Regions:
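Cytoplasmic-entry segments and transmembrane alpha-helices of multi-pass inner-membrane transporters
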Residues: 74-110, 124, 134-138, 143, ...
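Periplasmic/extracellular loop-to-transmembrane helix junction in inner-membrane transport proteins
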Residues: 1, 24-67
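Hydrophobic alpha-helical transmembrane segments of multipass integral membrane proteins
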Residues: 9, 13-17, 52, 56-80, ...
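Transmembrane alpha-helices
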Residues: 122, 126, 159-190, 218
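Short cytoplasmic-facing helical segments at TM-TM junctions of multi-pass membrane proteins
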Residues: 135, 139-177
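Loop-to-helix entry region at the N-terminal start of transmembrane alpha-helices
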Residues: 53-61, 111-132, 170, 175, ...
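Glycine-rich helix-loop "coupling/hinge" segments at transmembrane-helix boundaries
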Residues: 111, 140, 187-219, 223
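Conserved small/polar residues in nucleotide/adenosyl-binding loops
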Residues: 224-231
Length: 231
């Protein structure tokens, strides 16, 4: 209970500061709408269905890119953690790609995959792949050697060692990797939708900026923040 109360203290203070600034008119209402005006706009977007429509599309993109990274990163992390020879082949290219920010590769991704959904999924995939891969790899690699010796003494096959010993030992690291990957998926979604999209929360923010609707921009930003905080 105490942790929960501490968690809402800072957001409450920020909203209070926002209210005071808007009440004192330090900035014009055009530049910084009040919390009440923003809440009214959010209600209108919910009633019209526009907010749900854009949110659903954004959720689908995050889910698609995240699931693709899980399908690729988990087995690749397990293989690299178990096999030094396999790791020696994969590690140089993975180490190179790891230091390339996904948003920096957006022009090349758009050139290769166009501006449809494929490019957005690739951006989210690249952002969420390495946290899960590296945590899976370190979890498998860090398995207690004594447990592996026990498996060998019981004549476990390589598959049995991975399934019965290494995977259970790596589960905490994999869980952390999944959480980090999901957070990075949301961060990458913001860049992907702001640059090349005709729908989604990022598109709604960009369209509102062009239409001079800072209240809608704030609703979209708060929605991004709340979704990321939930993860």
């Amino acid at each position: 209970m105490r942790t929960w109360k501490n968690g809402i203290l800072l957001p409450f203070l920020l909203v209070l500061l926002w209210y005071i600034i808007s009440k004192l008119q330090i900035f014009s209402s055009y530049l910084l709408p009040s919390p009440a005006a923003t809440a009214i706009t959010a209600g209108e977007l919910i009633r019209s269905g526009m907010l749900w429509q854009h949110l659903l599309i954004s959720l689908q993109r995050v889910a698609g890119g995240f699931l693709c990274s899980v399908v690729v990163a988990l087995p690749l992390g397990i293989l690299c953690g178990r096999s030094n020879s396999f790791q020696s082949y994969c590690w140089p290219i993975l180490e190179f790609l790891r230091h390339v920010p996904p948003l920096a590769a957006i022009p090349l991704i758009i050139l290769w995959f166009g501006i449809d959904e494929g490019s957005k999924l690739v951006i989210i995939f690249l952002a969420s792949f390495f946290p899960l891969f590296l945590n899976t790899y370190s979890g498998i690699k860090g398995c207690d050697r004594k447990l592996l010796e026990v498996g060998r003494s019981l004549h476990f096959t390589a598959w049995q060692q991975a399934r019965l010993i290494q995977l259970p030992a790596a589960l905490p690291a994999i869980a952390v990797g999944l959480q980090l990957s999901l957070g990075y998926s949301w961060r990458a979604l913001i860049g992907a939708e702001l640059i090349a999209a005709s729908s989604g929360i990022g598109y709604m923010i960009l369209d509102a900026e062009q239409m001079s609707r800072p209240d809608i921009v704030l609703v979209g930003c708060l929605l991004y923040t709340s979704d990321a905080a939930d993860e």
